[in-house]
Amino acid sequence: MKEKKKITIMSIVIALLSISLSVLIYLCFFADKYLTDLGYTKQQVKLIHQYQLEDEIKEYNQSLIYALNSEDFNEKNIHYYLLFNSQIDYTDSINKLSELYSISELKEILTILDYDQTVELVDYDKISNIANFKKLIDKQYTVKDSVSLTNTLAEDALEKFLTLPTLEDPTVFTSLLDKGYDVDTIISLYDKVGAETFSKLSNFKYFSSLSEMLEDSSFNFSLLARYLMYMDDQGVSVGSAIYHVSSNDDFIEDPDFSSFYDNINEVTDTSLTVLVNKSNKLSENYVPDNLEEVSADYRNSMQSLQKEAIEAFIKMSDDCYAAVDRRILVYSGYRSYEAEESLYNDYIAASGDGDSSKVDSFADRAGHSEHQTGLAIDVCQKSYSYNEFDECLSSDWMYEHCYEYGYILRYPSSRAFLTGHYFTSYHYRYVGVEVAKLIQQYNWTLEEYDYLFD
Protein backbone atom coordinates (compact mmCIF):
# COMPACT_ATOMS: atom_id res chain seq x y z
CA MET A 1 0.00 0.00 0.00
CA LYS A 2 2.82 2.35 0.89
CA GLU A 3 4.63 1.40 -2.29
CA LYS A 4 1.54 2.20 -4.36
CA LYS A 5 1.18 5.60 -2.68
CA LYS A 6 4.83 6.35 -3.35
CA ILE A 7 4.36 5.52 -7.03
CA THR A 8 1.34 7.84 -7.23
CA ILE A 9 3.27 10.74 -5.71
CA MET A 10 6.14 10.13 -8.09
CA SER A 11 3.73 10.17 -11.02
CA ILE A 12 2.32 13.51 -9.93
CA VAL A 13 5.80 14.97 -9.53
CA ILE A 14 6.81 13.70 -12.97
CA ALA A 15 3.64 15.16 -14.48
CA LEU A 16 4.28 18.52 -12.88
CA LEU A 17 7.86 18.46 -14.07
CA SER A 18 6.65 17.62 -17.55
CA ILE A 19 4.23 20.53 -17.53
CA SER A 20 6.91 22.88 -16.23
CA LEU A 21 9.31 21.60 -18.85
CA SER A 22 6.67 22.11 -21.54
CA VAL A 23 6.02 25.65 -20.35
CA LEU A 24 9.74 26.30 -20.25
CA ILE A 25 10.15 24.90 -23.74
CA TYR A 26 7.25 27.08 -24.92
CA LEU A 27 8.70 30.17 -23.30
CA CYS A 28 12.17 29.45 -24.55
CA PHE A 29 11.16 28.49 -28.03
CA PHE A 30 7.61 29.28 -29.11
CA ALA A 31 7.23 32.57 -27.17
CA ASP A 32 10.68 33.64 -28.23
CA LYS A 33 9.85 32.67 -31.79
CA TYR A 34 6.73 34.85 -31.63
CA LEU A 35 8.85 37.79 -30.51
CA THR A 36 11.64 37.17 -33.00
CA ASP A 37 9.05 36.85 -35.75
CA LEU A 38 7.89 40.36 -34.80
CA GLY A 39 11.45 41.54 -35.40
CA TYR A 40 13.02 41.54 -31.95
CA THR A 41 16.63 40.37 -31.57
CA LYS A 42 17.60 37.73 -29.02
CA GLN A 43 19.08 40.42 -26.80
CA GLN A 44 15.87 42.43 -27.02
CA VAL A 45 13.82 39.30 -26.25
CA LYS A 46 15.88 38.78 -23.09
CA LEU A 47 15.05 42.32 -21.99
CA ILE A 48 11.36 41.74 -22.70
CA HIS A 49 11.45 38.59 -20.56
CA GLN A 50 13.37 40.43 -17.86
CA TYR A 51 10.56 42.93 -17.46
CA GLN A 52 7.80 40.31 -18.06
CA LEU A 53 6.33 42.13 -21.04
CA GLU A 54 5.68 39.08 -23.23
CA ASP A 55 1.90 39.20 -22.94
CA GLU A 56 1.75 42.91 -23.75
CA ILE A 57 3.80 42.83 -26.94
CA LYS A 58 1.60 42.82 -30.04
CA GLU A 59 4.00 44.36 -32.54
CA TYR A 60 7.56 45.50 -32.94
CA ASN A 61 7.83 48.61 -30.77
CA GLN A 62 10.83 50.80 -31.54
CA SER A 63 10.03 53.21 -28.71
CA LEU A 64 10.21 50.34 -26.21
CA ILE A 65 13.57 49.22 -27.58
CA TYR A 66 14.92 52.76 -27.43
CA ALA A 67 13.80 52.97 -23.81
CA LEU A 68 15.20 49.58 -22.77
CA ASN A 69 18.61 50.58 -24.13
CA SER A 70 18.56 54.18 -22.94
CA GLU A 71 20.37 55.66 -19.98
CA ASP A 72 17.10 57.52 -19.37
CA PHE A 73 15.20 54.24 -18.93
CA ASN A 74 12.85 54.22 -15.95
CA GLU A 75 11.27 50.89 -15.11
CA LYS A 76 8.12 52.46 -13.65
CA ASN A 77 7.41 54.06 -17.04
CA ILE A 78 7.49 50.83 -19.07
CA HIS A 79 3.78 51.00 -19.84
CA TYR A 80 4.20 54.59 -21.02
CA TYR A 81 6.90 53.48 -23.47
CA LEU A 82 4.53 50.84 -24.83
CA LEU A 83 2.01 53.54 -25.79
CA PHE A 84 4.48 54.94 -28.32
CA ASN A 85 5.98 53.35 -31.41
CA SER A 86 8.13 56.00 -33.03
CA GLN A 87 11.31 55.85 -35.06
CA ILE A 88 12.58 58.76 -32.96
CA ASP A 89 13.97 58.15 -29.48
CA TYR A 90 11.48 59.94 -27.23
CA THR A 91 12.48 58.18 -24.01
CA ASP A 92 13.32 61.34 -22.09
CA SER A 93 10.16 63.10 -23.30
CA ILE A 94 8.00 60.10 -22.38
CA ASN A 95 9.49 60.19 -18.89
CA LYS A 96 8.46 63.85 -18.62
CA LEU A 97 4.97 63.09 -19.93
CA SER A 98 4.58 60.44 -17.23
CA GLU A 99 4.99 63.19 -14.64
CA LEU A 100 2.14 65.18 -16.19
CA TYR A 101 -0.37 62.56 -17.29
CA SER A 102 -1.72 59.22 -16.13
CA ILE A 103 -1.64 56.24 -18.48
CA SER A 104 -5.35 56.63 -19.25
CA GLU A 105 -4.95 60.36 -19.94
CA LEU A 106 -2.03 59.77 -22.27
CA LYS A 107 -3.96 57.04 -24.10
CA GLU A 108 -6.78 59.53 -24.67
CA ILE A 109 -4.37 62.20 -25.88
CA LEU A 110 -2.84 59.75 -28.35
CA THR A 111 -6.25 59.34 -29.97
CA ILE A 112 -6.12 63.09 -30.70
CA LEU A 113 -2.46 63.73 -31.50
CA ASP A 114 0.31 61.86 -33.29
CA TYR A 115 3.51 60.94 -31.48
CA ASP A 116 5.41 64.09 -32.45
CA GLN A 117 2.55 66.37 -31.35
CA THR A 118 2.13 64.46 -28.09
CA VAL A 119 5.79 64.84 -27.22
CA GLU A 120 5.40 68.59 -27.79
CA LEU A 121 3.17 68.67 -24.69
CA VAL A 122 6.20 68.46 -22.39
CA ASP A 123 6.84 72.14 -23.19
CA TYR A 124 3.44 73.28 -21.89
CA ASP A 125 1.35 73.15 -18.75
CA LYS A 126 -0.82 70.09 -18.22
CA ILE A 127 -4.03 70.09 -20.26
CA SER A 128 -6.84 70.86 -17.84
CA ASN A 129 -9.63 69.32 -19.92
CA ILE A 130 -8.73 66.82 -22.65
CA ALA A 131 -12.23 66.85 -24.17
CA ASN A 132 -12.08 70.63 -24.66
CA PHE A 133 -8.53 70.31 -25.95
CA LYS A 134 -9.81 67.92 -28.63
CA LYS A 135 -12.45 70.44 -29.73
CA LEU A 136 -9.73 73.01 -30.35
CA ILE A 137 -7.49 70.57 -32.20
CA ASP A 138 -10.50 69.66 -34.36
CA LYS A 139 -10.82 73.38 -35.19
CA GLN A 140 -7.24 73.22 -36.55
CA TYR A 141 -5.59 75.15 -33.73
CA THR A 142 -1.97 74.28 -32.97
CA VAL A 143 -1.06 72.13 -29.99
CA LYS A 144 0.41 75.16 -28.22
CA ASP A 145 -2.64 77.34 -28.80
CA SER A 146 -5.03 74.52 -27.92
CA VAL A 147 -3.32 73.93 -24.57
CA SER A 148 -3.27 77.65 -23.81
CA LEU A 149 -6.92 78.19 -24.74
CA THR A 150 -8.06 75.09 -22.85
CA ASN A 151 -6.30 76.21 -19.71
CA THR A 152 -7.25 79.89 -20.05
CA LEU A 153 -10.90 79.97 -21.08
CA ALA A 154 -13.74 79.06 -18.75
CA GLU A 155 -16.19 76.47 -20.05
CA ASP A 156 -18.81 78.97 -21.21
CA ALA A 157 -16.17 81.25 -22.74
CA LEU A 158 -14.65 78.35 -24.65
CA GLU A 159 -18.01 77.31 -26.07
CA LYS A 160 -18.57 80.87 -27.35
CA PHE A 161 -15.00 81.04 -28.66
CA LEU A 162 -15.59 77.88 -30.67
CA THR A 163 -18.45 79.58 -32.53
CA LEU A 164 -15.88 81.84 -34.22
CA PRO A 165 -14.09 80.77 -37.39
CA THR A 166 -10.60 79.45 -36.69
CA LEU A 167 -8.50 82.49 -35.80
CA GLU A 168 -5.10 83.12 -37.35
CA ASP A 169 -3.82 84.26 -33.97
CA PRO A 170 -6.07 83.09 -31.11
CA THR A 171 -3.87 84.84 -28.55
CA VAL A 172 -5.57 88.07 -29.65
CA PHE A 173 -8.78 86.72 -28.11
CA THR A 174 -7.13 85.89 -24.78
CA SER A 175 -5.23 89.19 -24.83
CA LEU A 176 -8.51 91.09 -25.09
CA LEU A 177 -9.96 88.98 -22.28
CA ASP A 178 -6.95 89.81 -20.11
CA LYS A 179 -7.50 93.52 -20.74
CA GLY A 180 -11.02 93.31 -19.35
CA TYR A 181 -13.30 92.75 -22.34
CA ASP A 182 -16.01 90.13 -21.88
CA VAL A 183 -16.45 87.30 -24.37
CA ASP A 184 -19.60 88.72 -25.95
CA THR A 185 -17.91 92.08 -26.62
CA ILE A 186 -14.91 90.37 -28.20
CA ILE A 187 -17.14 88.29 -30.47
CA SER A 188 -19.13 91.41 -31.42
CA LEU A 189 -15.87 93.19 -32.21
CA TYR A 190 -14.79 90.28 -34.39
CA ASP A 191 -18.10 90.35 -36.23
CA LYS A 192 -17.71 94.09 -36.80
CA VAL A 193 -14.09 94.23 -38.04
CA GLY A 194 -13.59 90.79 -39.59
CA ALA A 195 -10.77 88.25 -39.30
CA GLU A 196 -7.95 90.28 -40.87
CA THR A 197 -8.33 93.33 -38.63
CA PHE A 198 -9.10 91.22 -35.56
CA SER A 199 -5.75 89.45 -35.97
CA LYS A 200 -4.03 92.83 -35.48
CA LEU A 201 -5.75 93.76 -32.21
CA SER A 202 -3.40 92.13 -29.71
CA ASN A 203 -2.30 95.54 -28.38
CA PHE A 204 -5.74 97.15 -28.64
CA LYS A 205 -6.48 99.18 -25.50
CA TYR A 206 -9.40 98.64 -23.12
CA PHE A 207 -12.37 100.99 -23.49
CA SER A 208 -15.27 100.41 -21.13
CA SER A 209 -17.72 102.01 -23.56
CA LEU A 210 -16.86 99.74 -26.50
CA SER A 211 -19.55 97.18 -25.71
CA GLU A 212 -22.27 99.84 -25.83
CA MET A 213 -20.80 101.33 -29.00
CA LEU A 214 -20.86 97.99 -30.80
CA GLU A 215 -24.59 97.71 -30.11
CA ASP A 216 -25.26 101.01 -31.91
CA SER A 217 -26.32 100.43 -35.51
CA SER A 218 -24.46 103.59 -36.58
CA PHE A 219 -21.13 102.46 -35.13
CA ASN A 220 -18.20 102.71 -37.54
CA PHE A 221 -14.88 101.22 -36.43
CA SER A 222 -12.94 103.72 -38.52
CA LEU A 223 -14.35 106.53 -36.33
CA LEU A 224 -13.76 104.80 -32.98
CA ALA A 225 -10.92 107.04 -31.80
CA ARG A 226 -12.90 110.14 -32.68
CA TYR A 227 -15.96 108.85 -30.78
CA LEU A 228 -13.79 108.31 -27.72
CA MET A 229 -12.02 111.66 -28.03
CA TYR A 230 -15.37 113.43 -28.40
CA MET A 231 -16.72 111.70 -25.29
CA ASP A 232 -13.63 112.80 -23.33
CA ASP A 233 -13.74 116.37 -24.61
CA GLN A 234 -17.48 116.95 -24.42
CA GLY A 235 -18.51 114.60 -21.62
CA VAL A 236 -21.35 113.14 -23.70
CA SER A 237 -22.91 109.70 -23.92
CA VAL A 238 -21.95 106.95 -26.37
CA GLY A 239 -24.99 107.56 -28.54
CA SER A 240 -24.39 111.31 -28.62
CA ALA A 241 -20.72 110.87 -29.54
CA ILE A 242 -21.55 108.49 -32.38
CA TYR A 243 -24.20 110.87 -33.69
CA HIS A 244 -22.05 114.01 -33.57
CA VAL A 245 -18.86 112.46 -34.93
CA SER A 246 -20.82 110.76 -37.70
CA SER A 247 -22.11 114.25 -38.52
CA ASN A 248 -18.49 115.53 -38.49
CA ASP A 249 -19.31 117.90 -35.61
CA ASP A 250 -15.86 117.33 -34.11
CA PHE A 251 -14.18 118.77 -37.21
CA ILE A 252 -12.40 122.12 -36.81
CA GLU A 253 -11.20 123.66 -40.04
CA ASP A 254 -8.73 126.11 -38.48
CA PRO A 255 -7.77 124.90 -35.03
CA ASP A 256 -5.74 126.91 -32.54
CA PHE A 257 -2.41 125.19 -33.14
CA SER A 258 -0.74 126.80 -30.15
CA SER A 259 -3.32 125.15 -27.88
CA PHE A 260 -1.89 121.75 -28.80
CA TYR A 261 1.08 122.66 -26.60
CA ASP A 262 -1.08 123.23 -23.52
CA ASN A 263 -0.67 119.70 -22.14
CA ILE A 264 2.64 118.17 -23.13
CA ASN A 265 3.57 114.53 -22.57
CA GLU A 266 7.20 113.44 -22.42
CA VAL A 267 7.87 110.66 -24.95
CA THR A 268 9.65 107.62 -23.49
CA ASP A 269 8.67 104.89 -25.96
CA THR A 270 10.63 105.35 -29.18
CA SER A 271 9.32 102.34 -31.12
CA LEU A 272 8.38 102.53 -34.81
CA THR A 273 4.92 103.83 -33.92
CA VAL A 274 6.10 106.54 -31.52
CA LEU A 275 3.78 109.55 -31.56
CA VAL A 276 5.65 112.84 -31.69
CA ASN A 277 3.57 115.96 -32.22
CA LYS A 278 2.73 119.28 -30.60
CA SER A 279 1.45 117.46 -27.51
CA ASN A 280 4.15 114.78 -27.29
CA LYS A 281 7.76 115.80 -26.86
CA LEU A 282 11.06 114.00 -27.31
CA SER A 283 13.97 114.68 -24.98
CA GLU A 284 16.54 117.13 -26.27
CA ASN A 285 19.11 114.34 -25.81
CA TYR A 286 17.26 111.79 -27.91
CA VAL A 287 19.13 110.53 -30.97
CA PRO A 288 18.06 107.27 -32.70
CA ASP A 289 20.56 104.43 -32.26
CA ASN A 290 20.53 103.15 -35.82
CA LEU A 291 20.80 106.23 -37.98
CA GLU A 292 22.37 105.67 -41.38
CA GLU A 293 23.10 107.94 -44.29
CA VAL A 294 20.67 107.72 -47.21
CA SER A 295 22.62 106.75 -50.34
CA ALA A 296 23.20 109.50 -52.88
CA ASP A 297 20.80 108.09 -55.49
CA TYR A 298 17.86 108.43 -53.09
CA ARG A 299 18.38 111.84 -51.50
CA ASN A 300 18.35 115.46 -52.54
CA SER A 301 21.22 116.32 -50.19
CA MET A 302 23.02 114.69 -47.26
CA GLN A 303 20.31 113.00 -45.16
CA SER A 304 20.05 110.29 -42.50
CA LEU A 305 17.23 107.98 -41.37
CA GLN A 306 16.80 104.90 -39.25
CA LYS A 307 18.04 101.84 -41.16
CA GLU A 308 14.63 100.17 -41.51
CA ALA A 309 13.08 103.36 -42.85
CA ILE A 310 15.87 103.71 -45.43
CA GLU A 311 15.47 100.15 -46.69
CA ALA A 312 11.72 100.59 -47.10
CA PHE A 313 12.14 103.94 -48.83
CA ILE A 314 14.65 102.60 -51.36
CA LYS A 315 12.27 99.79 -52.30
CA MET A 316 9.39 102.27 -52.61
CA SER A 317 11.44 104.72 -54.68
CA ASP A 318 12.58 101.96 -57.05
CA ASP A 319 9.04 100.65 -57.50
CA CYS A 320 7.73 104.16 -58.12
CA TYR A 321 10.38 104.68 -60.79
CA ALA A 322 9.43 101.38 -62.42
CA ALA A 323 5.74 102.30 -62.36
CA VAL A 324 5.70 105.97 -63.47
CA ASP A 325 9.28 106.65 -64.58
CA ARG A 326 9.76 109.21 -61.80
CA ARG A 327 12.24 109.05 -58.92
CA ILE A 328 11.22 109.97 -55.34
CA LEU A 329 14.01 111.43 -53.22
CA VAL A 330 14.41 112.21 -49.53
CA TYR A 331 14.53 115.98 -49.27
CA SER A 332 14.74 116.05 -45.49
CA GLY A 333 15.18 113.20 -43.00
CA TYR A 334 16.60 113.18 -39.49
CA ARG A 335 16.96 116.55 -37.79
CA SER A 336 18.39 116.95 -34.30
CA TYR A 337 16.73 118.78 -31.43
CA GLU A 338 19.19 121.64 -31.92
CA ALA A 339 18.47 121.82 -35.66
CA GLU A 340 14.73 121.96 -35.01
CA GLU A 341 15.19 124.65 -32.37
CA SER A 342 17.24 126.76 -34.77
CA LEU A 343 14.75 126.25 -37.60
CA TYR A 344 11.78 127.23 -35.42
CA ASN A 345 13.56 130.34 -34.18
CA ASP A 346 14.35 131.30 -37.77
CA TYR A 347 10.64 131.05 -38.59
CA ILE A 348 9.80 133.23 -35.59
CA ALA A 349 12.34 135.84 -36.68
CA ALA A 350 11.09 135.75 -40.26
CA SER A 351 7.49 136.30 -39.11
CA GLY A 352 8.40 139.86 -38.20
CA ASP A 353 6.25 140.23 -35.10
CA GLY A 354 7.53 137.21 -33.17
CA ASP A 355 4.03 135.71 -33.08
CA SER A 356 4.52 131.99 -32.37
CA SER A 357 0.86 131.20 -33.10
CA LYS A 358 1.46 131.89 -36.78
CA VAL A 359 4.56 129.72 -36.88
CA ASP A 360 2.81 126.93 -34.94
CA SER A 361 0.41 126.54 -37.85
CA PHE A 362 3.15 125.13 -40.10
CA ALA A 363 6.18 124.28 -37.93
CA ASP A 364 6.96 122.27 -34.81
CA ARG A 365 8.87 123.44 -31.79
CA ALA A 366 12.07 121.65 -30.79
CA GLY A 367 11.36 118.16 -29.44
CA HIS A 368 7.96 118.09 -31.12
CA SER A 369 9.16 117.30 -34.64
CA GLU A 370 8.95 113.78 -36.05
CA HIS A 371 12.16 114.43 -37.93
CA GLN A 372 14.03 113.90 -34.65
CA THR A 373 12.86 110.25 -34.67
CA GLY A 374 14.69 109.46 -37.90
CA LEU A 375 11.45 107.93 -39.16
CA ALA A 376 9.92 110.97 -40.90
CA ILE A 377 10.74 112.22 -44.38
CA ASP A 378 9.98 115.20 -46.53
CA VAL A 379 10.14 114.00 -50.13
CA CYS A 380 10.43 115.49 -53.56
CA GLN A 381 10.42 114.22 -57.10
CA LYS A 382 13.82 114.36 -58.76
CA SER A 383 14.39 117.76 -60.42
CA TYR A 384 11.48 119.31 -58.50
CA SER A 385 11.12 121.15 -55.20
CA TYR A 386 9.34 119.47 -52.29
CA ASN A 387 6.78 122.29 -52.43
CA GLU A 388 5.81 121.09 -55.90
CA PHE A 389 5.43 117.45 -54.90
CA ASP A 390 1.63 117.57 -54.87
CA GLU A 391 1.71 118.31 -58.61
CA CYS A 392 4.06 115.46 -59.53
CA LEU A 393 3.21 112.02 -60.94
CA SER A 394 5.19 110.35 -58.16
CA SER A 395 3.01 112.05 -55.53
CA ASP A 396 -0.13 110.24 -56.69
CA TRP A 397 1.71 106.94 -56.87
CA MET A 398 3.26 107.34 -53.41
CA TYR A 399 -0.03 108.35 -51.81
CA GLU A 400 -1.68 105.23 -53.21
CA HIS A 401 1.09 102.73 -52.45
CA CYS A 402 3.06 104.08 -49.47
CA TYR A 403 1.38 101.77 -46.92
CA GLU A 404 2.71 98.74 -48.79
CA TYR A 405 6.19 99.81 -47.70
CA GLY A 406 5.29 100.85 -44.14
CA TYR A 407 4.84 104.58 -44.77
CA ILE A 408 1.80 106.80 -44.17
CA LEU A 409 0.93 110.31 -45.31
CA ARG A 410 1.36 111.93 -41.93
CA TYR A 411 -0.76 115.05 -42.35
CA PRO A 412 -3.76 114.28 -44.60
CA SER A 413 -6.31 116.87 -45.59
CA SER A 414 -9.09 117.89 -43.18
CA ARG A 415 -7.32 116.33 -40.18
CA ALA A 416 -5.49 119.35 -38.73
CA PHE A 417 -7.79 119.25 -35.68
CA LEU A 418 -6.23 115.86 -34.91
CA THR A 419 -2.66 116.16 -36.18
CA GLY A 420 -1.86 119.81 -35.49
CA HIS A 421 -0.86 120.27 -39.12
CA TYR A 422 -2.63 121.29 -42.29
CA PHE A 423 -2.43 118.93 -45.26
CA THR A 424 1.20 118.39 -46.25
CA SER A 425 1.67 116.36 -49.42
CA TYR A 426 5.40 115.77 -49.02
CA HIS A 427 5.64 114.67 -45.37
CA TYR A 428 5.55 110.91 -44.77
CA ARG A 429 6.25 108.77 -41.75
CA TYR A 430 7.54 105.21 -41.43
CA VAL A 431 5.54 103.04 -38.98
CA GLY A 432 6.08 99.52 -40.36
CA VAL A 433 4.00 97.62 -42.89
CA GLU A 434 1.37 96.07 -40.61
CA VAL A 435 0.51 99.32 -38.84
CA ALA A 436 0.59 101.29 -42.10
CA LYS A 437 -1.88 98.84 -43.66
CA LEU A 438 -4.23 99.22 -40.71
CA ILE A 439 -4.01 103.02 -40.78
CA GLN A 440 -4.62 103.03 -44.53
CA GLN A 441 -7.55 100.61 -44.27
CA TYR A 442 -9.41 102.75 -41.74
CA ASN A 443 -8.19 106.14 -42.98
CA TRP A 444 -6.74 106.96 -39.57
CA THR A 445 -4.12 109.47 -38.55
CA LEU A 446 -1.25 108.33 -36.35
CA GLU A 447 -2.97 110.20 -33.51
CA GLU A 448 -6.03 107.97 -33.86
CA TYR A 449 -3.95 104.81 -34.03
CA ASP A 450 -2.00 105.85 -30.94
CA TYR A 451 -5.24 106.56 -29.07
CA LEU A 452 -6.49 103.03 -29.73
CA PHE A 453 -3.35 100.92 -29.39
CA ASP A 454 -0.62 100.42 -26.79
Give the residues covered by each predicted segment.
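Extracytoplasmic cell-surface/polysaccharide-interacting catalytic and binding patches
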Residues: I25-G333, Y337-D454
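Hydrophobic helical h-region of N-terminal Sec-dependent signal peptides
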Residues: L17-I25
